[in-house]
């Protein structure tokens, strides 16, 4: 009895006992919300590499940031009053008296300003190169992120340059258009926020906000279409406008994801402070930018597939790509027991089983 119990206890270490087998898991939707997180987790290294491409490829923007931050400018003081020179002369000639002090206190007030230097204009010139690099980077990264969303094998370096070489003309042209449109919208918003207030200004502000959001959503689809179809830029823009309105549900979810990333960045900088400022600087350089881009591509591609690709293949089934693995020989089955697997392994290696020895 004791031997039997001992044998039963040690049975848990017996590799020949039948295994639990594979459980039946419900299949995930190819374009579903849950699959986004699975795909993101499985490809986080590649998405990080895409972020590096975005940062290094758009290097001219760092020169513009340096200019806007004032690092290339010199300090100066500008008087508020046109009578500053007269008051200043009286102050110098008459000396310090109650009258000159009163006059200088009224007309001698100055404000601190930053004035451009030669280095500022050099940085402006270097920063303007963004109009040439922006389209290339967006095309290359859109191709990589689209393939990740589709579940295809991705080779980040070669895929990036393949997409750039294949679409460089459209990427260059639309990259310039993209920078100009984005710059105009940002400039209008800045002036409307910090300019004079009024009913007309308020209406113009909200109209600009709506246009900016609409164009931001259109950009989900522009570069994905560029690397997927052979279409003219005008047709790509037209289709993107249609997709921005038709695919509202997916577009809004992606927009909320982008806003969540920006909100976290805001918290790290202004709410938490301290060591979290380091995270606020590091995250956009490592993962945040490509994460937001992947959200947009994931939302866009499957809507494009639903409304353009699948209907086309239904009308032209002979052009549908054939699955190259469909007719491959089965290498492993899951309908056999662990004991049968072990017997097969022993047979292949010329090892006799206990039954054969008997």
Please give the residue ranges for each predicted region.
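Helix-coil boundary and N-terminal low-complexity module in membrane systems
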Residues: 1-190, 201, 220, 225-239, ...
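Membrane-interface helix-boundary signature
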Residues: 197, 201-204
